[in-house]
Regions:
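Substrate-binding N-lobe of the ribokinase-like
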Residues: 29-89, 306
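Short beta-strands and strand-loop turn motifs
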Residues: 104-106, 131-139, 166, 184-187
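Conserved phosphate-binding/catalytic loop of the ribokinase/pfkB sugar-kinase fold
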Residues: 95-130
């Protein structure tokens, strides 16, 4: 099985506040709090671990509260490689009112110097081999030149590492320069990239194929939420449906879990259709857990049996 790595330059403590009702400009009361060490790459590694796949999570940690972050990674049994820097790991706060949609508040993070990025890059390049899988996920922290991050990713790809990029820090031109194995843009990014909205599955499939043809990635996967997902390599496209969830608990982290599913199945050498069915099963099952908690293996299995390639 191929080795899997994740890279998180911008981790966060994910705080989830559940409440009966939220009203702006009023005092609001919280019924329960859930706190997880997160960041997109960490979420991917955690989803993999819960579903029986090991990975190594490279992560930059602020010294002020990094010990608490590491304690949670150890609790979850994750294999991780930390790079320490001055400052404090940020917090992402999500309000979950029972009677309305969730609201997210993101705090700022530490600054990362080029020297810290170089230290992380050396650690990653020392272990990654041709054919290994790596997910670079989350936005770039302050202090880094985007060109330096692009150069890091290009070196990985030049060494034969199959790189997924899931970050809103890059423009279409940046992605064309990086040319990763896979990207998973959201609807806003697609509009930004192509100038046209996605209104249905066929629109999404066309958009995915167009992005590949423009050279932004070898493959493009677009999530349609509860309506499934599409995938294209520019030549072939697949549209997948997923079962409807009567009462989804939280959609936060579902995209990260979807990518975990891609890595989980690809590392095992499974065929394209099975990889994509696994991916949407991970993502859908993640909506059945609180906050950014990973999808349970039994839920993934149940959902997988109900996925379809249309």
């Amino acid at each position: 099985m191929k080795a899997i790595y994740t890279v998180t330059l911008n981790p966060a403590f994910d705080l989830h506040y559940r409440m009966t009702h939220f009203e702006a400009q009023k005092e609001n009361y919280v019924d329960s709090i859930l706190c997880d060490a997160g960041g997109k790459g960490i979420n991917i590694s955690r989803a993999l671990k819960v579903n029986g796949t090991d990975s190594t999570a490279f992560v930059i940690l602020g010294d002020e509260n990094g010990a608490a972050f590491e304690a949670q990674l150890k609790r979850d049994g994750l294999h991780y490689a930390p790079i320490h820097t001055a400052g404090r790991i940020r917090e992402n706060i999500t309000l979950h009112p029972a009677d309305s949609r969730e609201t997210r508040i993101s705090l700022d993070t530490f600054r990362v110097t080029p020297e810290i990025l170089h230290e992380l890059e050396k650690s990653v390049l020392d272990v990654c081999r041709a054919g290994d899988l790596l997910a670079f996920a989350g936005r770039n922290p302050k202090g880094l030149e985007k060109a330096d991050v692009i150069a890091f990713l290009r070196r990985l790809i030049a060494n034969g590492v199959r790189v997924i990029v899931d970050s809103n820090s890059f423009t279409p031109e940046d992605l064309t320069e990086i040319h990763p194995w896979l990207i998973k843009p959201n609807e806003q990014e697609i509009v930004s990239f192509l100038g046209t909205p996605v209104e249905n599955a066929q629109d999404a499939a066309n958009a995915a194929a167009e992005l590949v043809k423009r050279g932004v990635a070898e493959e493009v996967m677009i999530s349609l939420g509860g309506d499934g997902a599409v995938w294209s390599d520019g030549q072939d496209s697949l549209i997948l449906s997923v079962p409807k969830l009567a009462h989804p608990v939280s959609t936060i982290g579902a995209g990260d879990s979807t990518l975990a599913g891609v890595l989980h199945a690809t590392a095992r050498g499974l065929d394209r259709e099975t990889v994509l069915r696994t991916a949407v099963s991970f993502g859908t099952a993640a909506c059945m857990t609180e906050g950014t908690l990973p999808p349970k293996a039994e839920d993934v299995k149940a959902v997988f049996g109900q996925t379809r390639v249309l």
